[in-house]
Amino acid sequence: MALARALAARPRLLLLDEPLAALDQTTRARVRHTLRRHLAGFGGVCLIVTHDPVEAVSLADRVLVLEGGEAVQDAPPAEVTRHPRSPWVARMLGGNAWEGTAGPDGTVELAGGGLLTTAPGEAIPPGPGALVLAVIAPEAVSLHLARPEGSPRNVWAGTVRELTAVGSRLRVLVTSPEVPALVAEITPAAAADLGLTDGTRVWTAVKATEVTVVGL
């Protein structure tokens, strides 16, 4: 109702500060859809302030990300999602983000220790020796009770530290002495088949083609 009154005045500038923050998850999705429809026909400029990444990428034509009081990225939502410019941005959108140094052969030497392999022949911008950010989607991380065989180039032993429900799926936090902490996203059925609990020893695997690397 407040939005309808604001739009009825035909303002040239509309400021929405955390417009959906007070709503429950079900209502938020419905109102987000309605808000997106109304904003599509709004002739002025709308500025949305939010801490919700879903809200930002679904409602905005352009996203300005502030971290520590500084602008770290200003780009269309699709660009922010595909190529986040800081670990905070990537994690805000639900991804794993590791800082490191680009190697000469498509590898990334991770800042916290360990080595990450990217797709064969892929040129890592802006080149060897540069500081980069490696981003891995949680759904690209597979979990195993024994060391996996086959094609994965990135395989590490670790321990389950946390299981969190996200909608109809589970996010599993795995720590490892070889690489920084990693989040995998799997189905509850898969978690049950693996018998995952806090403290379960597992192997994590990530295909080289599932690693996205951007320059910092």
Model-derived regions, located:
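Glycine/charge-rich catalytic "coupling/switch" loops of P-loop NTPases
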Residues: 113-164, 180-181, 185-216
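Short aromatic-glycine-enriched beta-strand elements
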Residues: 168-173
